[in-house]
C-alpha cells in the first residue's frame, strides 16, 4: 500500500507540468463540500512547492453558496500574499445545493450552504468586493449568468478603479 502513495497532489502536479508544456491555464474546480478543505489544502501545498511557486496561470473555484466561502477567501488571500504570486479565483454561486442540503441532513451535520437564494446572492456580491479589493493576490474571475451579479461586479470594478485586464467575467456556453 505504501508503495502506491505517489505523494500529495501528484495528479495536480502532473496536470500542471503538461499545462506548462502547452501554455495552458489550469483551474481547479470545486465539487462537494466534503472535499473542499482537502482541495484547498492540496492546491496550496502544490503551488507552494519550488517547482510550481512561480506559476500564475492557475486558479481555483470558490462556491459562494457555502457559508464559509468568506473565510476560505481570507485564508487563500493570506496564503497568496505570503507566496508572492497571485492565483486566479473564480467565484461561482454553486450548483449542488440540493445534494449539500440533503447530505448534511442525512448525516446530522450543519447545512454548509445558505438556505435562501438571496443569501447566496448577497454573499456572492460581498465576495466579489473582497476579491477585487485583493486583486494583487487573488485574480478575480466571476462565473455567473446572473445579470445583476455581473453588473454588480462591473460596478465594483469601476468604483475601485480596477486596472484593465485585472478581472474576467466567465460563463458556460449553452446555459
Regions found by a protein language model. Give the residues of each.
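Positively charged, amphipathic and often flexible ligand-engagement surfaces
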Residues: 1-175
Amino acid at each position: 500500500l505504501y508503495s502506491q502513495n505517489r505523494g500529495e497532489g501528484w495528479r495536480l502536479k502532473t496536470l500542471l507540468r503538461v499545462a506548462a508544456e502547452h501554455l495552458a491555464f489550469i483551474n481547479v474546480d470545486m465539487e462537494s463540500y466534503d472535499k473542499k478543505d482537502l482541495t484547498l489544502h492540496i492546491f496550496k501545498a502544490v503551488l507552494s512547492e519550488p517547482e510550481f511557486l512561480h506559476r500564475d496561470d492557475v486558479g481555483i473555484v470558490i462556491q459562494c453558496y457555502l457559508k464559509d466561502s468568506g473565510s476560505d477567501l481570507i485564508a487563500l488571500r493570506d496564503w497568496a500574499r505570503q507566496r508572492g504570486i497571485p492565483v486566479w479565483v473564480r467565484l461561482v454561486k454553486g450548483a449542488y445545493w440540493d445534494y449539500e442540503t440533503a447530505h448534511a441532513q442525512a448525516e446530522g451535520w450543519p447545512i454548509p450552504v445558505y438556505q435562501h437564494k438571496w443569501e447566496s446572492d448577497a454573499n456572492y456580491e460581498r465576495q466579489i468586493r473582497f476579491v477585487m479589493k485583493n486583486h494583487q493576490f487573488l485574480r478575480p474571475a466571476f462565473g455567473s449568468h446572473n445579470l445583476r451579479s455581473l453588473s454588480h461586479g462591473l460596478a465594483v470594478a469601476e468604483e475601485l478603479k480596477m486596472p484593465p485586464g485585472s478581472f474576467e467575467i466567465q460563463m458556460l456556453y449553452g446555459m
